[in-house]
Amino acid sequence: MAKFLSESQLGHFQSQGFLAGLDVFSIEQCEKFRTRTEEFEHHYPEEVSWALDIKCNLLFDWVYELSTFPLLLDIVSDLIGPDVLLTNSIFRIKEPFGSTHYGWHQDAARIQVNPAFVIVYISISDSTTENGCLRVIPGSNQQIKPFYLTSYADRQVARVNEVDESSAVDMVLQQGQVGIFDCNTIHGSSSNNSRNRRFALVNDYSPAIAQQSVGTGSGQLVRGSNSRKLWGEEPKPQGSFTQGNIIGRRMILNTYPENVLMGPLEKGQQPSFADQQF
């Protein structure tokens, strides 16, 4: 039995591939999170580009804390079952009048995951049409569409060949609300044309019974059990941006390099990711 979502919401997610406007976090929680992030940006400007990127949940205890908020995990469990792995956290910050945007894509295009994982967009600031909120194509979660590869943030990313944008839905969210979408849902966003930062944390949650089409994934067990051992288990961060956390993230990405964000490796290819060198 679902703990939070209604039968109507569950049905909508299954058929349309997304839910929006779920009230989860308080303004106080969001402001505290934002303050911690901006303090890090101030003290470690040279590390921001990689530390707030792939698997930042391994680096910062306050990212892990927000990502494992009980109400949020109740909602995720309603969608993917009782055994839940947090497989990635990544910041999505758009500066005022900036050019950052994301073309139409499906996160599981290069490495498919079955059963599907879900992606949670946590709106730390308001997310509006003007500041480049997330946009989704309803019903596009039913199959992987043809795609091409392009370079973004020093890695290869998939972009859908053709999209009917007339059906797109803007996922407008207030501060503290979350939007959730299936890993196969086509989504993207435009640039920020407002005077304020658009600030979000985006998390991937996978059912522990899921398997990747390529390689072996890894994640932090945040609900239930990982009894089938289909995923490598990641540690909880101890403190914020410690040397131990940085080394731990490096070990995970070297041991389990084939994840949905980094994509599959070619034969003989070595893992490549941004990191701090000691």
Regions found by a protein language model. Give the residues of each.
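Conserved hydrophobic/aromatic beta-strand scaffold that supports enzyme active sites
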Residues: A2, F18-A20, V24, I119-S123, ...
